[in-house]
């Protein structure tokens, strides 16, 4: 009978003072790998960042790539792109709810796995999480207990001027 692999417990302090490359999520003492490095993922992540960066003054936001977000006392997630209000007090770890967290789904991740990550953001108080699937060219919008799918048109964040054209976004995959 094969023995189960023992997953070492890592304290919050150890996690915060380590420098894993690439960075990993921290969930209740366990380090969770994040898949990065695929071209479609990189293209969408970069386009999302550039799209939001182009509107920081107009939308009164700050935009960060792969910033650590403390979603609970013993949980840290690293969204692909994180949108914060311009008034946010700069800290090295995001500890207040962002306006919006954006994730680009990797082919080896299931939508269920991405949604579990999204639930951490929503429980923290994030208004919405947008998950982008480059393979199906679908955006999944999560708000509270609600999830909608969108393949075209414009995604909007309620109560803000934030808007994102999906055809233009997914179009980078054709270039």
PLM regions with names:
Residues 1-175:
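Gly/Pro/Ser/Thr-rich low-complexity, intrinsically disordered segments predominantly at protein N-termini
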């Amino acid at each position: 009978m094969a023995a189960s692999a023992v997953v070492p417990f890592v304290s919050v302090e150890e996690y915060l003072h380590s420098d894993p490359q690439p960075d990993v999520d921290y969930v209740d003492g366990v380090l969770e790998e994040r898949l990065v490095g695929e071209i479609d993922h990189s293209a969408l992540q970069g386009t999302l960042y550039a799209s939001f960066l182009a509107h920081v003054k107009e939308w009164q936001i700050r935009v960060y790539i792969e910033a650590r977000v403390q979603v609970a006392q013993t949980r840290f997630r690293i969204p692909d792109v994180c949108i914060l209000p311009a008034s946010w007090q700069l800290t090295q770890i995001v500890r207040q709810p962002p306006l919006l967290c954006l994730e680009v789904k990797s082919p080896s991740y299931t939508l269920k796995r991405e949604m579990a990550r999204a639930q951490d953001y929503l429980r923290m108080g994030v208004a919405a999480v947008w998950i982008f699937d480059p393979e199906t060219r679908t955006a999944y919008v999560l708000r509270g207990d609600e999830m909608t799918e969108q393949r075209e048109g414009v995604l909007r964040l309620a109560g803000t001027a934030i808007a994102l054209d999906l055809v233009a976004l997914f179009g980078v995959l054709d270039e």
